[in-house]
């Protein structure tokens, strides 16, 4: 690399500022790191990958990846504020729950919250032993029933808590045990697909725009 190019790169980093990443209200507005930008507007729409452990300080949640998206920047305070984009459990963790001579039943469901957010939720239920196709079908039906009963009665923040801290998974397991012995249920993944607006639901896509 030429000296001129090295100098240009160095100058580019010199003008960048570091912004503190702040979680949304549902996670108590805690700081989860910093991100650089030479212009604040370029941060808008940037996705942040953190963990529930980083947010809560509880090591038992180190396997829960939380995806946030920057939607607002305070240039004076050097803070980047975020909204919830989705979550996903670490694949190694899911792999550790999958055992020989047992079954994994996965269901993917699109559902709306009470306050107008459209979500895609993936549920994994693990049985104690290998079960039959008819039992898998019945358990998947229970997954669907619980998701479609609980989520529309909650706000997005309530759904986030119910997904990440086990309330929805526990309800699915309790009902599914009437069909077959259940070892565990996890809300493996979620994604916000739509968000409310004055004109109605819009795709949950945030695009950075330079100031006029």
From Swiss-Prot:
Keywords, comma-separated and alphabetical: Ribonucleoprotein, Ribosomal protein
Superkingdom of origin organism: Archaea
Entry GO MF terms: structural constituent of ribosome
Transmembrane segments: none
GO biological process, one term: translation
Pfam families: Ribosomal_S3Ae
GO cellular component: ribonucleoprotein complex; ribosome
InterPro entries cross-referenced by the UniProt entry: Ribosomal_eS1, Ribosomal_eS1_arc
Family annotation (HAMAP family): Ribosomal_eS1
Classification via NCBIfam families: PRK04057.1
Family: Belongs to the eukaryotic ribosomal protein eS1 family.
Name by which UniProt lists this protein: Small ribosomal subunit protein eS1
UniProt source species: Ignicoccus hospitalis (strain KIN4/I / DSM 18386 / JCM 14125)
Encoding gene (name): rps3ae
């Amino acid at each position: 690399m030429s000296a001129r190019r090295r100098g240009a790169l160095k100058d580019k980093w010199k003008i960048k500022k570091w912004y503190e990443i702040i979680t949304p209200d549902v996670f108590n507005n805690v700081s989860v790191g910093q991100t650089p930008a030479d212009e604040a507007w370029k941060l808008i729409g940037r996705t942040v990958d953190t963990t529930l452990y980083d947010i809560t300080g509880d090591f038992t949640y180190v396997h829960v990846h939380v995806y946030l998206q920057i939607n607002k920047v305070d240039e004076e305070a050097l803070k980047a504020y975020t909204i919830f984009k989705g979550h996903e459990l670490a694949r190694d963790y899911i792999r550790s729950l999958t055992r020989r001579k047992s079954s994994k039943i996965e269901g993917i469901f699109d559902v709306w919250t009470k306050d107008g957010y459209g979500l895609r939720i993936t549920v994994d239920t693990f049985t104690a032993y290998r079960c039959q196709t008819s039992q898998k079908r019945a358990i998947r039906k229970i997954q669907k029933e619980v998701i479609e009963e609980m989520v529309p009665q909650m706000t997005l923040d309530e759904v986030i808590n119910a997904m990440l801290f086990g309330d929805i998974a526990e309800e699915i397991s309790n009902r599914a045990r009437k069909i077959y012995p259940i070892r565990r249920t996890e809300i493996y993944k979620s994604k916000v697909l739509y968000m409310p607006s004055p004109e109605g639901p819009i795709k949950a896509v945030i695009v950075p725009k330079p100031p006029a």
